[in-house]
From Swiss-Prot:
NCBIfam families: PRK00504.1 (NF001764), PRK00595.1 (NF001860), rpmG_bact (TIGR01023). GO terms for biological process: translation. SUPFAM superfamilies: Zn-binding ribosomal proteins. The keyword Plastid applies. This is Large ribosomal subunit protein bL33c. It comes from Dioscorea elephantipes. Disulfide bonds: none annotated. Belongs to the bacterial ribosomal protein bL33 family. GO terms for cellular component: chloroplast; ribonucleoprotein complex; ribosome.
Amino acid sequence: MAKGKDVRVRIILECASCVRNGINKELPGISRYITQKSRHNTPNRLELRKYCHYCRTHTIHGEIKK
């Protein structure tokens, strides 16, 4: 049996520029990705460069709380 909490957890990555700029004028919405991370290897918040469909460019997507 597993001891304690699960090592791999599901996280949500959200576009930082969409959140900072508010609602985009061309396309309203905020880009979000769902992925997994290992708590053992990356205990801090995860930030990845992903494609934002609303900004139409690669931007920083940061981990948010559920």
